[in-house]
Structures are given as C-alpha cells and as structure tokens.
Amino acid sequence: MQAGLRIDVDTFRGTREGVPRLLEILDEAQIKATFFFSVGPDNMGRHLWRLIRPQFLWKMLRSNAAGLYGWDILLAGTAWPGKPIGRDLGHLMRQARAAGHEVGLHAWDHHGWQANAGHWSAAQLVEQIRQGVDTLSDILGEKVTCSAAAGWRADERVIEAKQAFGFRYNSDCRGQRVFRPLLADGSVGAPQIPVDLPTFDEVVGPSVAAKDFNAFILDRFRPENLNVYTIHAEVEGILMADDFRRLLAEARQQNIHFQPLGDLLPEFLNSLPVGRVQRGALEGREGWLGVQGA
C-alpha cells in the first residue's frame, strides 16, 4: 500500500533536536520522506495571543501543548527576537537532503504566515514566499521544487502567488486526491498533493489517548486512498520519537510503504483532475485552512 510521509519543521528547536532524531529513525527504517522546513525567524510563541480564542485554548489544553512541545517552543519570539532558523541550522537541512530525502519550503516566518496569510496582499504573499525560497535555495545549493503552506493556510490567492516560483508541486491543503488547482485566468497551477490523514495534535485528547494513537492512525490507511500522513519534528522528533519509531515498524508489518510526496505524482500530469483550493474548516484544528474543492 503506497503512502506519503510529510514532515513539517516549524521551529528552531524542532530543527535542532527533532530533525537529527527523525533522520536517524528514518535511516533505521530505510524510509525516505519529504521535509518541509521553516527557514526564517522562529516567532511561534506569538501564537499564545490566540489563547483568547476558545477553540485554540481548547486545542492547547486537549493536546497538553506545554508537555508536548516544551515552553521554549511555546514562548519563542515573544519577549525576544525569534532565532533565525535557516541561518543557524541550515546544515541540518542539507543533512536531510544528503540523506536522500525530498526537501521543500514550509515558510519564511511560520507564525507570520498562519496569522496573516488570509489578509496579506498579493505582493506580501509573494515576498514571504520569495524570502523563504531564496534562503532555502542558498542553504541547499539547488532549486527549491516543492512547498507546503504553514498550517495549511492556503486559498486561491496563495495558489496564484506560488505560481511564479515554478514549484513541481505544492501540498497546501487537506483533501482526498492529487489534483491541479484552477487559477483565476482559467489555467491550471502546479499539482496539489493534499493531506488526507489527521495529525497527532488534531485527534489526541479525550477521544484518543496518546498511547493509542498509532493504532488509531494506522487503521485509517486504505489501499484506495491517497494516504498522505503528516508528522511534526517538534512532536514525533522529540517527545513522541519512540512512538514514531514503533509506528514505522507496525506500518511495515501492515504493508504500508512510505515515500516522499513527489513520488505520488503520476507520470502524466494531464491525467490529474482539476479542482480548487478554498477556505474551509477541520475538526481539531483552530481557524480556517485550505481544503480541496470541486
């Protein structure tokens, strides 16, 4: 059974501590994945202002965010400037690429994108992407060929903004099938490879205990589905690393074969259906996010 493994790296600590651990685990399992890196300032602690929103507060309490992520992640960029992730930790991004993994852009400023992408102008969206692409390209010494919007905050404006960068594909939304997004002028954009499986922080809480998560998620893989699974370096690369190692072993026993997202693209892109990326909602996730539409 084919499956895509996507690894989002949102923070300085996730890069510094989570990425090396994940590279070790993936090497042991002989699995290649796609890493999407945030490369600018780590301002993730500024999300604490969202605690005044009941849905976000409930998510933080439900997932035990302080224990899961650590206070250094939850406070990053609040009382002091955010650390420059790419400048200080670019060698770990090169290490992921040298190990044979696919590497793409997650964000320049992850917090900034999540908080502002919905109302930034077209020029501001392009500038944020450009800063990230230029930085990651300089780090890797090669063209950046794929991207994934931070927090799945993507709509038709974001898809339009990304067209100028010539990405091979993007993974900006939640959905069920690989597709080509329709643009405002009637043409189609770079393929979208959506995520169709829930993440750890979206479901762990009253209904699913952390110890039961592996069984919960593996039960949702289906031969007829896309099976794109997202983990976070801040979670599965640190506190839940041993659980993730066990998940990969159990997946192999169930004939689930993880691969980089780019390997899920068909040989002939014209065979892909056309759809849209539009704003929607998802249980377990606060605020709007991009979803696949007709």
UniProtKB/Swiss-Prot annotation:
Catalyzes the deformylation of 4-deoxy-4-formamido-L-arabinose-phosphoundecaprenol to 4-amino-4-deoxy-L-arabinose-phosphoundecaprenol. The modified arabinose is attached to lipid A and is required for resistance to polymyxin and cationic antimicrobial peptides. CDD domains: CE4_ArnD. Pathway: Glycolipid biosynthesis; 4-amino-4-deoxy-alpha-L-arabinose undecaprenyl phosphate biosynthesis; 4-amino-4-deoxy-alpha-L-arabinose undecaprenyl phosphate from UDP-4-deoxy-4-formamido-beta-L-arabinose and undecaprenyl phosphate: step 2/2; Bacterial outer membrane biogenesis; lipopolysaccharide biosynthesis. GO terms for cellular component: membrane. Keywords: Antibiotic resistance, Hydrolase, Lipid A biosynthesis, Lipid biosynthesis, Lipid metabolism, Lipopolysaccharide biosynthesis. The gene is arnD. It comes from Pseudomonas fluorescens (strain Pf0-1). PROSITE patterns: NODB. It comes from the Bacteria. It is an enzyme of class 3 (hydrolase). This is Probable 4-deoxy-4-formamido-L-arabinose-phosphoundecaprenol deformylase ArnD. Residues 1-259 form the NodB homology domain. It catalyses: 4-deoxy-4-formamido-alpha-L-arabinopyranosyl di-trans,octa-cis-undecaprenyl phosphate + H2O = 4-amino-4-deoxy-alpha-L-arabinopyranosyl di-trans,octa-cis-undecaprenyl phosphate + formate. Its EC number is 3.5.1.n3. NCBIfam families: PRK15394.1. One of its GO terms (biological process) is lipopolysaccharide biosynthetic process. GO terms for molecular function: hydrolase activity, acting on carbon-nitrogen (but not peptide) bonds, in linear amides. Belongs to the polysaccharide deacetylase family. ArnD deformylase subfamily. Disulfide bonds: none annotated.
